[in-house]
Amino acid sequence: MGYDDRERDRERRRHRSRSRDRHRERSRDRRHHRNSRRKPSLYWDVPPPGFEHITPMQYKAMQASGQIPASVVPDTPQTAVPVVGSTITRQARRLYVGNIPFGVTEEEMMEFFNQQMHLVGLAQAAGSPVLACQINLDKNFAFLEFRSIDETTQAMAFDGINLKGQSLKIRRPHDYQPMPGITDTPAIKPAVVSSGVISTVVPDSPHKIFIGGLPNYLNDDQVKELLLSFGKLRAFNLVKDAATGLSKGYAFCEYVDLSITDQSIAGLNGMQLGDKKLIVQRASVGAKNAQNAANTTQSVMLQVPGLSNVVTSGPPTEVLCLLNMVTPDELRDEEEYEDILEDIKEECTKYGVVRSVEIPRPIEGVEVPGCGKVFVEFNSVLDCQKAQQALTGRKFSDRVVVTSYFDPDKYHRREF
């Protein structure tokens, strides 16, 4: 074998060796690629610090709208509930709180809201949802700054909450701009409702009630007292003149129990208050059954001390329903219940023969129909009419009594 032949053999061996090396390298690359696919990507769709709570699509929408500069990634520490960039999303993490108590401090405001957020389950993590508070003592309002956008939105559910005897008004700041893809409405939790918070914002819905024809001198508490005689309120707003602060004579409300809507409309529409007659109906135009509720024949009348006593039209019955007289708590005590029952019977017998009296009492863990109402059955319709004229507007336990005629058949079936 000549030199040239040996050289060609060596060249072929080197080529085969390089081919095997390249093949092994490609195999290792493929194995490495397959293994790497099992790990989550460190680069795709990873939100910048401070924006972990939103999806990539929401982040892109915010960039497109100019709310996040395309090249800016805020350098903020990551926490369980991220604190988003202060300049970029600060307006979405702030709430205006009006009608604050005189002399309340910023520390007290923060402590109160932090406690409430954890108490009703609106806090998303341990620690303080409220980071800062600024109070304007001259104008009686404050601004709260929260650690996350979502907790800020949820805190709006506290609109109307009571702090030191003051009903707080919670709103978005004037410079607030809704963020694309992020909900702007708080999810009302049962714990918030059961805490007795009555929001001052009544959202548009088929169950929103309009109450017109109110005497201008009636204040929030007096109007609420009338409405609460039918059930718990979710939201209430007495519309006032911005310059004078006086009532414009109309209000809006919504009940916690939506089934009360028709009942309250039936009971309040046409009620005479002094020289005015209430107009009560669903606020939504074209709502189903709104006209039927307005045309109901159930009769209700109210007499406030100092106002003339005018009976509304409608067929009376021999059963009288008394509202706004007792509370479920008062009825739980056996001795107090017996005293109330005896007082009512004794007073009602002054106007006629009383056949029976029913006062539904609360039962633990059971929703008792008509709990808090008093039903009195008279021997005749005439006796019932006399009792209604005498008892309506009277004070019982410092509450103004509201009366209405009740269907005798429902009474005997105990459909309260």
UniProtKB/Swiss-Prot annotation:
Signal peptide: none
Residue stretches making up the RRM domain: 93-175, 207-285, 318-408
Top-rank taxon, per record: Eukaryota
Basic and acidic residues: bias regions: 1-10
Pfam families: RRM_1 (PF00076)
Keywords in alphabetical order: mRNA processing, mRNA splicing, Nucleus, Repeat, RNA-binding
Keyword Repeat: yes
GO cellular component, one term: precatalytic spliceosome
Biased composition (Basic residues): 11-21, 29-40
Subcellular location: Nucleus
InterPro entries to which the protein is assigned, alphabetical: Nucleotide-bd_a/b_plait_sf, RBD_domain_sf, RRM_dom, U2AF_lg
Bilayer-crossing regions: none
GO terms under biological process: mRNA splicing, via spliceosome; nuclear export; positive regulation of RNA export from nucleus; regulation of alternative mRNA splicing, via spliceosome; RNA splicing; spliceosomal complex assembly
MF terms (GO), sorted A to Z: mRNA binding; poly-pyrimidine tract binding; pre-mRNA 3'-splice site binding; RNA binding
Family: Belongs to the splicing factor SR family.
Subunit structure: Forms a heterodimer with the U2AF small subunit.
Cross-referenced PANTHER family: RNA-BINDING PROTEIN
Physiological role: Necessary for the splicing of pre-mRNA. Binds to the polypyrimidine tract of introns early during spliceosome assembly.
Protein name (database record): Splicing factor U2AF 50 kDa subunit
Natural source organism: Drosophila melanogaster (Fruit fly)
Lineage: Eukaryota, Metazoa, Ecdysozoa, Arthropoda, Hexapoda
Gene: U2af50
